[in-house]
């Protein structure tokens, strides 16, 4: 019995059309020079977790539903008295997505989640870091269809960082635009 490997829609699109389009646009000599998606990091900072550890666990459970992968709870590295924060207290959670889960998450983000954001006018084109990575913030995590609005207690924001192998911001912008990221004009 032959086993067929599952290929996400965006990965197949990258292999079939996006890679050749970027090669023409930037004139790469080698296929390995063409920028590609490396990883996606989802981070949820939960300030209320300082007083109540269950908040960090609830946020981690929600992030696990969104990502389809178990997140890790992040802890403070030093004590800050103005925030009533001690060392090694839970302050949030994060998860790193790679390969198929990364492509599936980006597909859901672009096609389902971002259109559900209130007053969405496009992504900020200035949020590149100078090395080909893109970061965006989301104010409410309830835009993802995996979160049940009725059972949810609180809304948290989250940071999404898309890491690419691009050397410059222009290459990364061309790559993400080819993946249909809705940048503002």
Swiss-Prot record:
The keyword RNA-binding applies. Keywords: Ribonucleoprotein, Ribosomal protein, RNA-binding, rRNA-binding, tRNA-binding. GO terms for cellular component: ribonucleoprotein complex; ribosome. GO terms for molecular function: rRNA binding; structural constituent of ribosome; tRNA binding. The keyword tRNA-binding applies. InterPro entries: Ribosomal_uL5, Ribosomal_uL5_bac-type, Ribosomal_uL5_C, Ribosomal_uL5_CS, Ribosomal_uL5_dom_sf, Ribosomal_uL5_N. GO terms for biological process: translation. Pfam families: Ribosomal_L5, Ribosomal_L5_C. This is one of the proteins that bind and probably mediate the attachment of the 5S RNA into the large ribosomal subunit, where it forms part of the central protuberance. In the 70S ribosome it contacts protein S13 of the 30S subunit (bridge B1b), connecting the 2 subunits; this bridge is implicated in subunit movement. Contacts the P site tRNA; the 5S rRNA and some of its associated proteins might help stabilize positioning of ribosome-bound tRNAs. Belongs to the universal ribosomal protein uL5 family. HAMAP family: Ribosomal_uL5_B. PANTHER family: 60S RIBOSOMAL PROTEIN L11-RELATED. Part of the 50S ribosomal subunit; part of the 5S rRNA/L5/L18/L25 subcomplex. Contacts the 5S rRNA and the P site tRNA. Forms a bridge to the 30S subunit in the 70S ribosome. This is Large ribosomal subunit protein uL5. It comes from Rhodopseudomonas palustris (strain BisA53).
């Amino acid at each position: 019995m032959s086993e067929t490997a599952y290929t996400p829609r965006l990965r197949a699109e990258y292999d079939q059309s996006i890679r050749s389009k970027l090669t023409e646009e930037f004139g790469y000599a080698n296929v390995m020079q063409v920028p590609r998606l490396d990883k996606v990091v989802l981070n949820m900072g939960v300030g209320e977790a300082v007083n109540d550890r269950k908040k960090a666990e609830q946020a981690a459970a929600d992030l696990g539903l969104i990502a389809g992968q178990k997140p890790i709870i992040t802890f403070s590295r030093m004590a800050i008295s103005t925030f009533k924060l001690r060392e090694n207290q839970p302050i949030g959670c994060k998860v790193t997505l790679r390969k198929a889960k990364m492509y599936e998450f980006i597909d859901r983000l672009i096609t389902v989640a971002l259109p559900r954001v209130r007053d969405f006018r496009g992504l900020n084109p200035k949020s590149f870091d100078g090395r080909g990575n893109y970061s965006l913030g989301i104010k409410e995590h309830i835009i993802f269809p995996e979160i049940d609005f009725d059972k949810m207690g609180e809304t948290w924001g989250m940071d999404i960082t898309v890491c690419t192998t691009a050397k410059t911001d222009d290459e990364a912008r061309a790559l993400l635009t080819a993946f249909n990221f809705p940048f503002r004009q």
